[in-house]
């Protein structure tokens, strides 16, 4: 059989089939029937797409001899035969550009004319049996299924065969030929019998034991058993009149549908209390960098070497002293920790060869700051299950905080342009599928708008810090390692620049689970005097460590330089997401793309160029107490990016809850604006669900105040 396959099929198909089998750990020499089946399926997919094009009018056309002058685009994108990663990249890319629902399983083709994915089946059994197995496996209304058999039968979703008679006849003839060739060599019977059905997991697996008892206990009222409830759910039609549905449900449900009018909604209640404080893992607008241009020193790129080089650019160091203590901490320890960093950096200077990493001496101040030996001892459950008053720690309720103006300033700053570029053009990822050059064009325009944005600096800083901290946590678990906070950028003239924001010292990091915490102390340079907004810096101890000469319009002025020190912590999963912060670029690019798509579908042509180059047009950015704010397309890109970046920097359960619950209210208000006469029940419950997330988080409080501005203007 193996010889037959190699003679009968095109070498490219044979090679792809071998690769596919190796990917699943199967040997083409042993599983020869499977080898033949994969080749047949590949060939059917290629023949399905061969010669089918879409012309410049968008009409489907068949071209057998290559006419080099025709402006043609392939009608089908071939997904089968690519390696999995590449195949999913193509599928995702198609879904993003066309808005088609993403399939659960990898399909075989995408049809640009009918805008649907296609699953091709080739079976040695009855076509309808195989069709039902496929349909049952993929369970998607959207993916079109087309089955061929070796006997010339076929079956397709809704009897829609996609291709013309002749193209399908070519495939059937080829399959029939393969069958005859096999039969003449005595291979057909074994091949025919070797086909296994699509493996589908049985839907109704039995629930037994504790799970079964829990299921029976948690049934809604009036249901006697789980089966009885399942049958009801399966038969429940989700569309139609809400009141009718409610009456079908249960005697316990008595929801009255209230009309939602302009006068119905009230603003969200923001908490009272002391102003909220800064809780990001590193300083944002207040950060100060010590930088070197065109770095070319020995060991350039090794963080510790870069940091020492940056430190040497500053000459204004002075004896540090505490100017804003941390309320609860032992402040002299923070001061000693900074002095220790300076001393140990000096020690490195005196060594003959600079080491690549620096582990700090485990002094009492660092042990205190990093919470060494502070964690309660873990006891095995077996040893304490007989303790009769065993209980969880009482945790303190968080104290409510009010919205402070600093968080809006932070956001405004994040939307601004800096004078350096923080990403190269290819940072958002290369094109993988040949989906038009439109995608590249949009990406390049977008990159140009955001590459100098401060939010992009925060992304690169976040990626760097999280990567360095996760690396050190795994590589030096027991050490108090010194980690410089570094970023790289290019100046307006295109010169490379390395920046140092300060240092982190990490604590012990035996991180077994994703949520295990590693403590760290951060020490960051700044020119911001903490006494101007003391509430923002509640979690910090701030030292004055030097004087910096700044060039201003009136000449040189000397400004005190501060060091913001605090104890903080993070976990493996948080660092993993921090390393992925570049995704924020992608998320905001997709939001911009959907704006362009909407505009393009109105004008019935691609509007990318006009969108970015028509500088006179303004776009809505957001709501403020003054009304709807508008700005240039670049400003929209940067605002969307900043929102995405802040969602990452200030990620929290409060934000998750607020986003999910406020969205429901947003949709109701939008329905009212669109004159859809929405009705609601238990609106009070929805407000409660939203407001229980408004506790003390600065970013959530800011979003809630934006939401209130939106309500005011939406209901005018």
Curated annotation (Swiss-Prot):
Q: So where does Mn(2+) 1 get bound?
A: 41, 108, 119-120
Q: Which UniProt keywords apply?
A: Cap snatching, Endonuclease, Eukaryotic host gene expression shutoff by virus, Eukaryotic host transcription shutoff by virus, Host cytoplasm, Host gene expression shutoff by virus, Host nucleus, Host-virus interaction, Hydrolase, Inhibition of host RNA polymerase II by virus, Manganese, Metal-binding, Nuclease, Phosphoprotein
Give the Enzyme Commission number.
Answer: 3.1.-.-
Gene3D superfamilies given for it? Influenza RNA-dependent RNA polymerase subunit PA, endonuclease domain
Q: Which cofactor does it need?
A: Mn(2+)
Q: Which GO terms describe its cellular component?
A: host cell cytoplasm; host cell nucleus
Disulfide bonding pattern of the chain:
none
List GO molecular-function terms, semicolon-separated. Answer: endonuclease activity; metal ion binding; RNA binding
* Principal subcellular localization: host cell
The PTM entry states: Phosphorylated on serines and threonines by host kinases, including human casein kinase II.
Residues passing through the membrane, by range: none
Q: Per its database record, what is this protein's job?
A: Plays an essential role in viral RNA transcription and replication by forming the heterotrimeric polymerase complex together with PB1 and PB2 subunits. The complex transcribes viral mRNAs by using a unique mechanism called cap-snatching. It consists in the hijacking and cleavage of host capped pre-mRNAs. These short capped RNAs are then used as primers for viral mRNAs. The PB2 subunit is responsible for the binding of the 5' cap of cellular pre-mRNAs which are subsequently cleaved after 10-13 nucleotides by the PA subunit that carries the endonuclease activity.
- Please state which protein family the record places this protein in: Belongs to the influenza viruses PA family.
Q: How does it assemble?
A: Influenza RNA polymerase is composed of three subunits: PB1, PB2 and PA. Interacts (via C-terminus) with PB1 (via N-terminus).
The name of this protein is: Polymerase acidic protein
Native organism: Influenza A virus (strain A/Turkey/Ireland/1378/1983 H5N8)
